[in-house]
């Protein structure tokens, strides 16, 4: 009697474990078999995206330094400022903040 209960408990726990592992595998996007896109396309797409996005500012600065693009202002700029997207300002907004030209030609 005790042996049969232990066997039933073992089979039940094994079944639950297998179901949980299968759910974990499929919930994280793991696939078996052929992928829909080739590895070259995937690598090219990831390379383009990583070049366009400043995911890690310090690595981007290091890459520019190693390529020989030395710009001291860029290296001293905080990464928080580099992560903001560029804004397009209207001409009226630019004119509102523009300094007036001097009238006596003294710059």
Curated annotation (Swiss-Prot):
A biological process (GO) of this protein is: neuropeptide signaling pathway
Q: Which residues carry this modification: Pyrrolidone carboxylic acid?
A: 22
Query: What is the annotated signal peptide range for this record?
Result: 1-21
Q: Which GO terms describe its cellular component?
A: extracellular region
Keyword Signal set for record:
yes
As recorded, the propeptide runs across: 88-107
Q: Does the keyword Signal apply?
A: yes
Its job? Cardioactive peptide. Corazonin is probably involved in the physiological regulation of the heart beat.
This protein is called what? Pro-corazonin
State the gene name recorded for this protein.
Crz
